[in-house]
């Protein structure tokens, strides 16, 4: 059985995450927020103006002092585009000299299209299936977005697009077709084939880790690794770069801010939150 082994040899801080806390519009079974639901689900800052987020200015000043330019708005147990003051936050962050990117499931893209096109950082889309039944098993939603229309619509001169596909028990037989489909979009910079991560649910999620590694071994036989990116293999498939991303085994590094005021210098999200959430009170 495969295991999740954390690589604690990290690079210097490359970026920082703003981890929103609140209720999501999807229900992904592997969501990292489900590792510690008793701690995270009591918070909801989706409708709280960022000027009222505890320790937010401290976090931004820390990023400035460290020379960190790239920030990502993401959801720890929610989605970035659910934030009520999303467009205002973009202007505030980027007017301070940062480049803001987002991580999103895409379901609210049309509501925030103008804001997304203003982003100077990356737009990270999560696309785990193109099949309604499979998507419902993974994300708790059967509706598949019109990516043929939306992907070109969100691309602008200032942002770039990365698509993350989390390989799991439900979509394992669809991965090659998904990658082939996504590879036709010139607007997509690269595809990230992500492995599930967990700190507290190995008993239920190690099955997915093993599925990932089995698929990777098959892919590696047919497609050559041409480079690595922070310890992750880069393989060209159907003309598009696919980065095989085992999050905790890479050497990437980041600071993490949570909208309840917790600040963590630990790249490992759950571990960092558990070690720091009381200190930020």
Residue ranges and their predicted role:
Residues 42-44, 133-148, 152-251, 264, ...:
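Radical SAM enzyme [4Fe-4S]-AdoMet core and its adjacent flexible, acidic
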Residues 2-54:
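Canonical Radical SAM [4Fe-4S] cluster-binding loop centered on the CxxxCxxC motif
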């Amino acid at each position: 059985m495969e295991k999740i082994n954390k690589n604690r040899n990290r690079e210097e801080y490359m970026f920082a995450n703003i981890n929103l806390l609140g209720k999501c519009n999807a229900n992904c079974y592997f969501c990292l927020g489900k590792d510690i639901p008793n701690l995270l689900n009591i918070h909801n800052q989706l409708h709280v103006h960022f000027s009222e987020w505890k320790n937010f200015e401290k976090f931004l000043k820390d990023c400035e002092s460290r020379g960190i330019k790239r920030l990502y708005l993401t959801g720890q147990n929610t989605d970035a585009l659910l934030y009520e003051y999303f467009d205002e936050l973009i202007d505030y962050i980027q007017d301070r000299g940062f480049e803001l990117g987002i991580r999103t499931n895409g379901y609210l893209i049309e509501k925030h299209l103008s804001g997304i096109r203003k982003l100077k950082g990356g737009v990270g889309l999560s696309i785990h299936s193109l099949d309604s039944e499979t998507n419902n098993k993974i994300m708790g939603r059967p509706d598949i977005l019109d990516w043929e229309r939306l992907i070109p619509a969100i691309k602008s001169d200032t942002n770039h697009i990365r698509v993350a596909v989390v390989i799991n028990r439900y979509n394992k037989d669809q991965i090659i077709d998904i990658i082939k489909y996504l590879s036709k979009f010139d607007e997509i910079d690269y595809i990230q084939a992500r492995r599930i991560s967990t700190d507290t649910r190995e008993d239920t999620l190690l099955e997915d880790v093993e599925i990932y590694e089995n698929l990777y071994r098959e892919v590696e036989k047919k497609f050559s690794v041409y480079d690595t990116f922070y310890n992750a293999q880069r393989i060209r498939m159907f003309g598009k770069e696919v980065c095989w991303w085992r999050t905790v085994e890479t050497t990437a590094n980041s600071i993490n801010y949570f909208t309840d005021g917790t600040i963590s210098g630990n790249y490992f999200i759950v571990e960092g939150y558990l070690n720091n959430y009381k200190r930020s009170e």
